């Protein structure tokens, strides 16, 4: 990494810990800053805070005392999840204390070029696909960002010959100023996180910050299926490379079941390692990045054909007696499950769905349920999900949890069938998060395989 003097002997407050805050604290300390970390979690429940204290970093836990800002900090590094209307953040802005993001801090010291990926859906899968293809092509791609590897930690190990492949959320992008990736991908834009941003327009503006400092020597990859992309493309200085599953574009596109870049055929959609129309979009974005990075067509095709998905995101788990299991626990809304269902033959599919009841009906899902072999329904939303199944004329059974649902599905399945966990609901009625829910599906698969 670059050793810069910008933060030498500067008093810096890190607001909010988690993985990114811990990494930022260590990086800034290494750069000679005088760091104070403030986290709302009590100290005795905060192993990360305890570890930082042992390293000599000042830590204040249990609350966010506004008076802490009376200490004349010269910078604040804010955790992405803390909104800008937080009293501490508002006070810092009133005092004209510059607020940095952790990803921008990483950018300042990075020797490696950055490929940034954002969007409403498909970020993690596309980020992982891109890194896999670049590495298969002999390059050194390092995953970082919102994918679980804090950018300010990864950047300390990265050298000029590496490439940081960085997943970026709207929370991380909303406050950047200097951040400039060489290649940026926006997978799609849907109205999400409006409780944080306030409006779809503000959410889009946050995502659009990924390209704010890009020039014509940089590349911006946009989803041409969306009308908003054409509008946004007119306002960037970057060179735009579109991708589309609906029309031929001057970039990556789907035509007659084949994925192309420009006029070069790369791979058949049926040969992709993960199913679903959304994964064709993810693969097209990946192809665009790979071609811009000089990866050979045969390597791109081979890598995409062997890509098995990301854990809990339409993850191909394996087979038992020629029955295939997919873990899509990350599908916490109707749209995500619709996209998952698009990749399967409903007549051979058993769907496990249901979860937290948010009061919404599932009428929009009904057309996607038509012809399903069977549903296994669970969770608080079971009654609403049953109504959708009845409208689609799909038979169903009820289960008490994911383990029981998976066992029931396996008993019903026949050779050649697929069992898909794609709940279309959040997990919090039964599980602390979608990862725990998905892990129960994986554990049950392992038990069933052991008994087979």
From Swiss-Prot:
Bilayer-crossing regions: none
Gene Ontology CC terms, in alphabetical order: cytoplasm
SUPFAM superfamilies linked: MurCD N-terminal domain, MurD-like peptide ligases, catalytic domain, MurD-like peptide ligases, peptide-binding domain
Tree of life domain: Bacteria
Keyword Repressor found: no
Gene Ontology process terms (BP): cell division; cell wall organization; peptidoglycan biosynthetic process; regulation of cell shape
Entry's EC annotation: 6.3.2.9
Catalysed reaction equations from the record: UDP-N-acetyl-alpha-D-muramoyl-L-alanine + D-glutamate + ATP = UDP-N-acetyl-alpha-D-muramoyl-L-alanyl-D-glutamate + ADP + phosphate + H(+)
Enzyme class: ligase
InterPro entries: Mur-like_cat_sf, Mur_ligase_C, Mur_ligase_C_dom_sf, Mur_ligase_cen, MurD
Compartments it resides in: Cytoplasm
GO molecular function, one term: UDP-N-acetylmuramoylalanine-D-glutamate ligase activity
Annotated positions binding ATP: 119-125
Pathway: Cell wall biogenesis; peptidoglycan biosynthesis
Family assignment from sequence similarity: Belongs to the MurCDEF family.
Known function: Cell wall formation. Catalyzes the addition of glutamate to the nucleotide precursor UDP-N-acetylmuramoyl-L-alanine (UMA).
PANTHER family named among the record's database cross-references: UDP-N-ACETYLMURAMOYLALANINE--D-GLUTAMATE LIGASE
Name of protein: UDP-N-acetylmuramoylalanine--D-glutamate ligase
